[in-house]
Design a protein with these regions (language model features):
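N-terminal alpha-helical interaction blocks
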Residues: 2-161
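Interdomain "pre-motor" coupling segment immediately N-terminal to P-loop NTPase/helicase cores
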Residues: 113, 126-135, 141, 145-217
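Conserved interdomain linker/interface between the two RecA-like ATPase lobes of SF2 helicase motors
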Residues: 117, 124-126, 248, 389-456, ...
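N-terminal pre-P-loop "Q-motif" helix
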Residues: 226-249
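Conserved strand-helix element at the start of the C-terminal RecA-like helicase core
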Residues: 250-263, 273-274, 278-293, 370, ...
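Conserved motor-coupling elements within RecA-like helicase/translocase cores
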Residues: 292-337, 474-495
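Post-DEXD/H (motif II) to motif III coupling segment of the RecA-like Helicase ATP-binding lobe
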Residues: 335-412
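Conserved RecA-like helicase motor core of SF1/SF2 enzymes
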Residues: 344-348, 477-480, 484-522
Length: 522
């Protein structure tokens, strides 16, 4: 789809403040302006890409007086001359008449933008999912909403106040490059490489966003249903979260041991925010964990409809109050939630990603609160704790109070890149045989997909020869969830897996083997 181009114009009328705007379809603007008593519109030709038009409009608005048509033309030409494609340019003045023929009755279309941020290229799918018949040019509808100040439009990528390229969708200031653009024809179009998996953000692509309105839900009591009795440490953590709700502090850390039940601990503060008429986002870095959390949240809050957003599921609506999503999906939220619970903050891909950190915080309303849950807080969190900037609570033990298993390091000669005749070392075979004899299960982790294909296949093949049922699971496995269910129900003895199964899975009587543990990268 070609990038939209925008006409820069000035609208005037008796007793009215001159209005400087930009539009991809002047017919919509003429109808709206005429209905609001504007009589004349002067626009600059040719139309420009969104970031150039936006820059010109911003500078023109600093002139606090009505401009004569030719003066308006000269100012626009001077502003965009060094960067715009204006080899041939002129201006035209139109007389406005109040017909209203171009104005649409948009109903609740505005609600689709509440608390969200969308690229212009995402509008057709957005309107279609909301049950609207998509118009030939979806920007006709958004232009009317922009004029009515119901949504905001900006260039997805542009220059900030310091003259640095910045992606206004993901907040990145690096990883942005200039290139010839097939969509707008510019020779120096900015493109963000950080969030491109969610759609191409460029300086010629419009970005639409709007904050979620306050007081949108009626207050009603919500109580979580827990199928377990909290330990004293868990109860203390839940009470600390409740006190945090009253403190006015922006963020709180739940520092809990692996398997410490931190997810259930957060249900109390979630219920409180929902009771007060607020909205909650439960964000997880990995989509596999999202799938596992769906039934737990549904069981805990049966009275509240759960919306799920991941790479596989999209059940969100504008009226959703409790949302479970991957951290990548938070890129499409804007000042939307009163509470964000970020689970497994130490996990890839959230850990080390400035884009996802920015997205999660931007998903919060200005008065919103952030709860971060992790077993391994990073150095920045520890420094904030030491400086008293980050309140926190610890859950030092699991509910059964048994110590965490300490890994045993076994030195085994393994070829870095095993060939087809590779066979599992004796120590690996012995461990898997013990798993079978003790009626337990096993996960065998490998650091790379390449090793998974060779070593994993060899281990599964060896297992078949002695009656051990095994399977391979990775991000490329179509039946990954099925393999996990088979292991849970005892239909498989072991799974050879990539790091896809390192989180979000709880299995009784499980042994874990990590092969090639000396690999520095996975």
């Amino acid at each position: 789809m070609l990038a939209p181009k925008y006409f820069i114009y000035q609208a005037t009328g008796p007793g009215l403040k001159p209005r400087i705007e930009m539009s991809s379809n002047l017919r919509v603007d003429c109808a709206w302006l005429a209905a609001h008593d504007y009589l004349q519109l002067t626009f600059f030709q040719p139309a420009q890409t969104v970031w150039i038009a936006e820059m010109a409009v911003r500078q023109l608005r600093t002139v606090r007086q009505e401009l004569a048509p030719r003066r308006f033309f000269k100012l626009v030409k001077r502003i965009i001359g060094p960067i715009g494609m204006i080899k041939y340019c002129n201006f035209q003045t139109l007389t406005l008449t109040a017909t209203g023929s171009e104005l649409e009755t948009l109903g609740d279309l505005e609600q689709q933008f509440w608390g969200r941020a969308f690229l212009g290229s995402e509008l057709p799918d957005l309107f279609r999912s909301a049950g609207y018949a998509v118009p030939w040019n979806p920007e006709d509808w958004t232009q009317q909403l922009v004029l009515e100040a119901k949504i905001t439009r900006t260039a997805a990528v542009s220059y900030n106040n310091w003259g640095m390229p910045e992606c206004r969708r993901c907040g990145a200031t690096h990883g942005i490059y200039e290139a010839d653009c097939l969509f707008c024809g510019a020779r120096h179009c900015l493109t963000c490489s950080n969030c491109q998996t969610l759609g191409r953000a460029t300086s010629c692509a419009p970005l639409y966003y709007q904050s979620y309105p306050e007081h949108s839900f009626v207050k009603q009591p919500v109580q979580p249903r827990l199928d377990l009795t909290l330990t004293p440490a868990q109860q203390r953590a839940m009470e600390a979260l409740d006190a945090f709700c009253d403190s006015g502090r922006p963020a709180f850390l739940v520092w809990a041991v692996c398997g410490g039940g931190k997810t259930e601990v957060s249900f109390g503060i979630i219920a409180r925010v929902l009771t007060e008429g607020g909205r909650v986002l439960f964000a997880i870095p990995r989509k596999e964990v999202v799938n596992d959390l769906v039934p737990r949240l549904q069981d805990a809050f049966p009275m509240v409809e759960l919306a799920v957003l991941s790479g596989e599921t999209h059940s969100y609506t504008a009226r959703s109050r409790l949302v479970l999503a991957t951290t990548h999906q938070s890129v499409r939220f804007y000042h939307s939630f009163d509470l964000v619970v970020l689970d497994e903050a130490d996990a890839f891909p959230y850990q080390g990603s400035e884009m996802l950190h920015h997205a999660v915080r931007r998903a919060l309303k200005s008065t919103g609160r952030l709860v971060v849950m992790t077993a391994t807080p990073n150095r920045q969190m520890l420094d904030q704790i030491k400086g008293g900037q980050l309140p926190y609570v610890t859950i030092p033990a699991r509910y059964h109070r048994q110590a965490l298993v300490e890994p045993e390091i076994v030195l085994v000669k393994l070829q870095p890149l095993p060939g087809k005749k590779w066979e599992p070392p004796e120590s690996v075979c012995r461990q898997l045989l013990q798993v079978k004899a003790r009626q337990r299960k096993a996960l065998v982790f490998l650091p790379t997909l390449r090793l998974l294909e060779s070593v994993g296949t060899a281990i599964v093949t060896w297992g078949k020869t002695i009656g051990l049922a095994g399977a391979i699971t990775s991000s490329k496995t179509k039946n990954a969830n099925r393999n996990k269910e088979l292991l849970l129900h005892g239909k498989l003895d072991f799974i050879v897996a990539s790091t896809i199964l390192e989180r979000g899975i709880t299995i009784d009587d499980l042994d874990v083997l990590v092969l090639f543990a000396d690999f520095e990268r996975v």
